[in-house]
């Protein structure tokens, strides 16, 4: 249940899982990046939910190829309102995910609104991580912060987390 968002051909939510298809000439005419296995193929590289720091379907493409998400509802006919709802029950054992994406335009706002609601249900407790790879610039915060300049640590040791810094 991933999400991609473009504005006039410009990628706003980057899918780093597509890194093997980017900058083909710079990568010796299509060779994969070194991070292809350790990051790009991992669920954390996509704009979707990660459960217990593991890639969906156990990272096994043969298993994932046997399943697909189910569309629950969609309506793309409105001029100012479009919606898509889908669910996934096979990506993680015992976890059901449902994602609702809504695109809304209104004369009161200069730019459209995108609502992204992702629900996860399970009978067991899990750690949920929800990365959104925004292709933008940090401008300001309304609270003080300290910039990390040394002693950075990785968020984890495998499944792409070794490429993320705290």
Located regions from the model:
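Catalytic and substrate-binding regions of extracellular carbohydrate-active enzymes
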Residues: 1-151
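Glycine-rich (often Gly-Gly/Gly-Pro-rich) flexible segments and glycine-rich loop motifs
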Residues: 46, 148-166
């Amino acid at each position: 249940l991933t999400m991609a968002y473009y504005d006039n051909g410009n990628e706003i939510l980057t899918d780093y899982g597509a890194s093997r298809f980017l900058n083909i000439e710079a990568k010796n005419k299509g060779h994969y990046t070194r991070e292809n296995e350790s990051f790009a193929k991992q669920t954390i590289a996509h704009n979707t939910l990660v459960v217990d720091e593991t890639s969906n379907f156990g990272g096994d493409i043969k298993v994932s190829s046997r399943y697909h998400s189910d569309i629950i509802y969609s309506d793309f006919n409105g001029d100012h309102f479009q919606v898509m709802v889908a669910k996934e029950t096979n990506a993680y054992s015992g976890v059901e995910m449902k994602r609702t994406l809504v695109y809304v335009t209104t004369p009161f706002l200069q730019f459209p609104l995108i609502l992204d609601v992702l629900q996860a249900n399970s009978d067991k407790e899990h750690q949920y991580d929800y990365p959104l790879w925004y292709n933008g610039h940090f401008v300001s915060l309304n609270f003080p912060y300290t910039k990390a300049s040394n002693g950075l640590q990785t968020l984890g040791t495998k499944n792409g987390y070794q490429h993320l810094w705290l």
